[in-house]
A protein has these predicted regions:
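Extracellular/secretory pathway-exposed regions associated with glycan biology
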Residues: 1-60, 64-139
């Protein structure tokens, strides 16, 4: 279980600019955690892995961040919370089949408050942060 996390030290104002940077560190993490940042500002993370969907159905994903973030599910951007901004949450609902689905979350912190929360809810459970047992590095 877990995700591949790439950590960057950079001054950017959009997740689109992360791809132009070089990661300082790449490691396996249990979930979407940014506490391993070595700085209070001017950093970014890219989390890559798979999410295990327990049953066919509609799921709502939530992405709360300060500053910008995006969520990409099965190679489609489903949540765009990008840009330099204070704490904000965006969400998207999508129909998914049971099984593993590719998930990527890109996040950057320019300055000020720091937050990244990745949550979901389904017919069988209320909104909650995505727990490590649902996250996998590869299939």
């Amino acid at each position: 279980p877990g995700l591949l996390a790439k950590y960057y030290e950079c001054e950017i104002n959009s997740t689109k600019n992360i791809d132009e940077e070089h990661p300082v560190e790449t490691k396996i993490v249990s979930s979407f955690l940014t506490e391993t940042s070595r700085r209070d500002s001017n950093y970014a993370f890219v989390f890559t892995g798979y999410i295990s969907v327990p049953k066919d159905g509609y799921y709502t994903f939530y992405l709360e961040s300060n500053d910008g973030s995006v969520m990409i599910l099965n190679d489609d951007k489903i949540i765009d919370n990008d840009g330099a901004h204070g704490n904000a949450e965006e969400s998207a609902s999508i129909s998914l089949k049971a099984g593993l689905h590719k998930i990527d979350v890109k996040y950057f912190q320019l300055g000020g408050g720091q937050i990244l929360k990745v949550a979901w809810e389904g017919a069988e459970f209320e909104k909650q942060e995505i727990r490590p047992q649902f996250l996998f590095i590869d299939i």
